[in-house]
Amino acid sequence: YKNKGKDWDSETPSQEYYDELFRVSKNQIIWGANYMVDKIKRPSMGWIYWDKQNGDSDFSDGELAFTSFNRALRSFKYHLSKDRHARFHPTQKPVQLYEWILDKYANEGDKILDTHLGSGSIALACHNRGFDLTGFEIDSEYHNKAVERLRVHRSQLTMF
């Protein structure tokens, strides 16, 4: 991916964002929440750890997500090199991670909200698992690429 000087990731969302998120949603999973605990203001034992299996590299060993679920911390091991798709978003996550999350945390009939759609990996996972998704992305370039990615994914599934 190329991050062409975008500055959308220069600060965390506002307190008003988190207040509204908790108002409109029953449960939450928030990636990068370890940088925003001062705004989340809720205890959680049910964090998710994505072990990126980077080995001895300069990149982060993993990512943390806050969850509102009263469960033990869970980890998911997956190296991005297993993905055969080119990355186009700097925080792109694998579809397999979102499928694992849906399998572990979502119930049939749940409606999924993603306020930071990014590359659209969650959209592919929701499509694969049969969940309704409402997604938002502030960057039109990423939004368009995510929509196209989902369109191609859906068309490939209907060919066979």
Labelled PLM ranges:
Residues 1-113, 119-160:
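Class I S-adenosyl-L-methionine-dependent methyltransferase catalytic core
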